[in-house]
Structures are given as C-alpha cells and as structure tokens.
C-alpha cells in the first residue's frame, strides 16, 4: 500500500525587542547566566506581568506579513505545566484567540511551480528558561531566556513532502527576516522548529496519527528527520502496526528519530484566561500604522530584479535570500552600479568571504559605495579582474576607498605601450632559451612569454593591451 505524507510545522520565533515580554529585563542573547533577570522572571510572590507594547507591534507586523486576520480583542492565557526552567509552573501564552489566524504564504518548489501553504494561527507567548546538566552531577537553571518574547507560527497540514517543508521554512524565514521583528538565527535559538508528520492511504481524507519531531536545529535536519520518520511510519503501517501519537527527537548522528514521550493534548495543560493581564484592543488605526512599516518582501523584489534589472530568476533568488544582501544590492544599483556586475560580486567573492569569516555583510568593511567604485576601476581599465580580488579583500577587511587603496598600493594596471614595450624587450633579454625556441618554431613557445610578462609586471599589465603588444614584438623578433 502506498501512503501520502502529511506535514504541518510549528515555528517558534524570538522577537528582537530590547526587553522581555512581561518584564523590563534585557532580552538580548549571549549574556552571563541569569544576568538578564529580575523578580518577575524569577516569579517572586506578588509580582505582576506588564505587557511590552513592542511585542504586540511585532505580532501585528508578522500577522500582516503572513496574510493573516487579526484578533482585535486579544487576550492571553495560562498554559499550566511544571518544569525547573519555568518557575511560575505556567507559561503565559495564547490559546483560543491568537493575535493572528487564517493566513498563508506561497512556496516555490524545485520544478518552479508555486504552492500556497495555509497558516492556522500565530500566537504570542513567553519563552522558558534553559536547563543545563553539569559534569559535577548538578543541574543548573539559566533564566536569561525566561520571558523572552516569542511568536509561534502554526501551519496547516498542507505540506506533502519533506522538500515542501524545507521550502516553506525557507520562505517563512525570509518573510520574518524582512519584517525586522527577528534575526531568525537557528544557531542562537531565535528560530526553532517542531514538525508534525503522519501518513494516510492515498485517497483517504482523514489524517493519520501524527508524531511530533523535536531537536531539529537546522532546515537540513528538519528535512532529514521527516524523511526518516516518513520511512519509519510507512514500515510500521505496512507491517500491520499502528502509529502512536508521540514526541520523538531527531538524532543527528544516526539520522534517526527516537521516542521521547507520549504526546500530551491541549487538555493536559489546563488552559484558562490569564487573570493578571487585561484584554488588549487592537484598533484599525493601530493596524494601519504598523502596515505602513511593512517592507518590500522577497517575492516582490525577485520579480523586480528579473523585470527591471534583467537578472535571472536564480540570481534574483540568491540576492533576496537575506534582506541585508538585498538591501546592499539595491543601494549599489541605485548609486549607479551595473546590476549584473554587482550581482556577480555578491554571489561570488563576497559570499565566499562571508562564509569563510562567518560574518554577515553588515559586519565587514565593504559598502555599496566602495564596491561600485571598484567595479568602475575594472571597467575603465585601472585594475584587472585579478587585481580586483586583492582590492576586494582589503575593502572587506578595512573598508575605505577602492581608488585610494589601488593608488597607495601601486596596483594601477599598466596600459601605456611606452611602459610595456621596454618591459617586453627586457623579458626577451632575460629568457634567451625561450627566444631560441620561438625562433626555431617550437610549438606553443610564444605562450611562455605571456607568463614571463605578467610576472615581470607583477600581474599589473593590462591583459588585452599587453597581449596585443607582445604579439607585435614577437612578430618583429621572428623577422630578425
């Protein structure tokens, strides 16, 4: 029997507000353990939560970006459970009335077709702290993350393959990143994914029993975990067994999913309205004000890059993968940069440098201005493409003016025949054996002089001019 795969994803996104959702503590990542805490985070008796308006702004922005309806009379609920990193023994979340509902985004599949994926809901909540287990036999609780604002985005079960899930996550990450409400860095925990997967016989409308996958710390691991779980469930069903509703974790080493626990239902959390927070009236004016802050989104930019700048769909997709790179490209073109040349540099040397240094484009010295300046120096023959790579590395590490560095470092390309011809004659004098080979008609003997000339000029000879002059002087040499 053949089965259809059914996948839904729950994505937790940390919002990049300065302070936490219900306390004034810093929400920034990477501080010393328990440095970003106060009495609210520790749940001291008598303390009350105070709503951070910026979190609601971010929630509205996310809902609009994901084509969602907005609950304009919004409230919070208590989700009750006990765990050491949750000192209140409940989490403030949203249950029956999330800030956003009935949304959708489009994904692009490998064959170029597009598919709409519905989004059931997006709700605001506080993050939990973090448990660490020491080698000394003790467990430690770090509450820096406790109360950091989250938005959980829950898709409908519209995906039919691990590849579609990967495409959905890619599109969702781009959209959230463009809104500016989160940096969506999985390596720092600001984007976390849980995947729900079930199988059903083709033609059956009713969903099968699902398993939830956790410990998915990259999009590739989401795909790998789903592929393994797809195979595991199919094997169980074909052997006459039944799938249990359970939570499983993905083991990156073995590539397998491993049982963690039997999955709880929402009734296990005993949700009820949060009594210490009021209802929040989200007015039409409030929504309209946030709507004005929405950016141009990746799909819109991709269409513009193809139609207005003549780039390929592939180039447009690469440039818009991160907002920082796309913004850099747009500014470079706006100040006169050739779109194709800027695109080539961003996808080539710049991307390689960023990967090798593990940095983003905002963290290096390269700017739209000095990149366009450098491309202009190539175009007017001041430097060669080879020399430009050296110039780029300097700009990336140190910033500054491309032209000033080229002059200071003596990298200006030699194009003057009155300078090049004496150098060519000196090359002949320094390589008598090669001259004899050339005069005797030895095959490819002339090509050796190209390397000698470039070496003599330290790579600064203008290749087109130098090759033309070299051919001219070799012809004279042959006649002697």
Curated annotation (Swiss-Prot):
Its EC number is 6.3.5.-. Heterotrimer of A, B and C subunits. Pfam families: GatB_N, GatB_Yqey. Coiled coil: none annotated. InterPro entries: Asn/Gln-tRNA_amidoTrfase_suB/E, Asn/Gln-tRNA_Trfase_suB/E_cat, Asn/Gln_amidotransferase, Asn/Gln_tRNA_amidoTrase-B-like, GatB, GatB_C_1, GatB_Yqey_C_2, Gln-tRNA_amidoTrfase_suB_CS. It comes from Streptococcus agalactiae serotype V (strain ATCC BAA-611 / 2603 V/R). GO terms for molecular function: asparaginyl-tRNA synthase (glutamine-hydrolyzing) activity; ATP binding; glutaminyl-tRNA synthase (glutamine-hydrolyzing) activity. Allows the formation of correctly charged Asn-tRNA(Asn) or Gln-tRNA(Gln) through the transamidation of misacylated Asp-tRNA(Asn) or Glu-tRNA(Gln) in organisms which lack either or both of asparaginyl-tRNA or glutaminyl-tRNA synthetases. The reaction takes place in the presence of glutamine and ATP through an activated phospho-Asp-tRNA(Asn) or phospho-Glu-tRNA(Gln). Keywords: ATP-binding, Ligase, Nucleotide-binding, Protein biosynthesis. This is Aspartyl/glutamyl-tRNA(Asn/Gln) amidotransferase subunit B. NCBIfam families: gatB (TIGR00133), PRK05477.1-1 (NF004011), PRK05477.1-2 (NF004012), PRK05477.1-4 (NF004014). It comes from the Bacteria. It catalyses: L-glutamyl-tRNA(Gln) + L-glutamine + ATP + H2O = L-glutaminyl-tRNA(Gln) + L-glutamate + ADP + phosphate + H(+); L-aspartyl-tRNA(Asn) + L-glutamine + ATP + H2O = L-asparaginyl-tRNA(Asn) + L-glutamate + ADP + phosphate + 2 H(+).
């Amino acid at each position: 029997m053949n089965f259809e795969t059914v996948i839904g994803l729950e994505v937790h996104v940390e919002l990049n507000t300065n302070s936490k959702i219900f306390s004034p503590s810093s929400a920034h990542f990477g501080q010393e353990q328990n440095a970003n805490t106060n009495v609210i985070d520790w749940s001291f008796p008598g303390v009350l939560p105070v709503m951070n308006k910026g979190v609601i702004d971010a929630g509205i922005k996310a809902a609009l970006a994901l084509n969602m309806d907005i609950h304009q009379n919004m409230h919070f609920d208590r989700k009750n459970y006990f765990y050491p990193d949750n000192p209140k023994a409940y989490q403030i979340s949203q249950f029956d009335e999330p800030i956003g509902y009935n949304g959708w985004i489009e994904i692009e599949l490998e064959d170029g077709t597009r598919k709409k994926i519905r989004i059931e809901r997006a709700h605001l909540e506080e993050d939990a702290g973090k448990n660490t287990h020491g080698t000394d036999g003790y467990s430690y609780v770090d509450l820096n993350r406790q109360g950091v604002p989250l938005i959980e985005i829950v898709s409908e079960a519209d995906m039919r393959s691990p590849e579609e899930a990967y495409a959905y996550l890619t599109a969702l990450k781009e959209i959230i990143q463009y809104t500016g409400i989160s940096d969506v860095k999985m390596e720092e925990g600001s984007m976390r994914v849980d995947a729900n997967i079930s199988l059903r016989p083709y033609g059956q409308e009713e969903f099968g029993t699902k398993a939830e996958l956790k410990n998915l710390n990259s999009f590739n691991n989401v795909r790998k975990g789903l592929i393994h779980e797809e195979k595991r469930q199919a094997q169980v069903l074909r052997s006459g067994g039944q799938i249990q509703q359970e939570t499983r974790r993905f083991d990156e080493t073995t590539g397998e999913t491993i049982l963690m626990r039997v999955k709880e239902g929402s009734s296990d959390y005993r949700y009820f309205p949060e009594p210490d927070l009021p209802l929040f009236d989200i007015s039409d004016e409030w929504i309209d004000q946030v709507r004005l802050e929405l950016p141009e989104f990746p799909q819109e930019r991709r269409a513009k890059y193809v139609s207005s700048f003549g780039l390929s769909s592939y180039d447009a997709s690469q440039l818009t993968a991160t907002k920082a790179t796309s913004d850099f490209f747009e500014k470079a073109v706006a100040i006169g940069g050739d779109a194709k040349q800027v695109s080539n540099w961003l996808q080539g040397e710049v991307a390689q440098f960023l990967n090798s240094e593990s940095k983003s484009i905002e963290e290096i010295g390269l700017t739209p201005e000095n990149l366009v300046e450098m491309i202009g120096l190539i175009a007017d023959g001041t430097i060669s493409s080879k020399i430009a790579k050296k110039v780029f590395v300097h700009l990336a590490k140190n910033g500054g003016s491309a032209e000033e560095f080229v002059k200071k470092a003596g990298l200006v390309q030699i194009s003057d025949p009155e300078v090049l011809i004496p150098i060519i004659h000196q090359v002949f004098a320094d390589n008598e054996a090669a001259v004899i080979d050339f005069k005797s008609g030895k095959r490819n003997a002339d090509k050796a002089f190209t390397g000698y000339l470039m070496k003599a000029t330290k790579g600064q000879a203008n290749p087109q001019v130098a090759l033309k002059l070299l051919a001219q002087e070799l012809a004279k040499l042959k006649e002697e």
